[in-house]
Amino acid sequence: PVYIFDALKKKTPEEWKAAYRKSKYFQNFSNNDASSKSYSSMKSPSLNTDFFNQFTTLVSRYFTVTIRDYERQGLMLFIAPVIALLINMLFSGDGAEVKAIFILVISTIWLGCSNAVREIVNERSIYKRERMVNLSIPAYLSSKMAVLLLFSLYQIFCLVGITSMKFYYSNQVGLFLILFYTSIIATILGLLISAVSRTEAFALTVLPLVLIPMVIFAGLVQYYRDMASWIQGFSGIWLSRWAYELSLSNSFSDGVGIIGFDSDGSVVAYGIMTTMLFLFLGGLVWMLKSLDKKK
């Protein structure tokens, strides 16, 4: 059945329409006058309607597939509470919030990327066939993000909620929102890695190469203030560095001085994170469009 997509690709929709109207099927089953009138008066569906229909269908399909994968679903539900409990067990004493928030940021990025990194590469052939019948890239990406971010909301709620039972965050809601924004960017990054990869094994190999520098250059393993100036500059290309600074500024301002971040750097951090979001999203859309040209 999949070969029908290859056959459909040989002609444009207008050519198929013209061929049908000349065929015996059209003559036998259509009233020419009524058909012509109804056809001429018919309005083409709006782009918004088409997007919404595709989006709802894709979300329903993707969510059903996800919840039926019991092993993956179990990991996505239980891993965040386990991480939060381990943070509570390990860190204590004055300034423990600095380390706890660091693990929260790294965990958020790791979960966002790892949740998404298999999504596109695993269904590349399905995606390419559906693009032949007018699958919308915005609808496709929006459906992926909607389901993945639903799980991210739960995971971040667990991370912040459980750790706040032990650690003092001056703004829990603000920390939650910052981590969720970080998760959005990390999820797009994971989808980008998935779109670039030809196999799942390659995607999983690339993932640590992205995540390990996030840990090293976030600003805690080596305090930001103790880094050489050029290393400080290099650390600026990593999402974790800005998410960590923003989280400390919002929820444990004393940690900003301990690490050596700029106490007035929140606006810059937001700006750079937003720039990363659009760069990753632009690269993802470009990669998906490039798949249309590949056989």
Predicted regions mapped to residue ranges:
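ABC ATPase nucleotide-binding domains
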Residues: 1-37
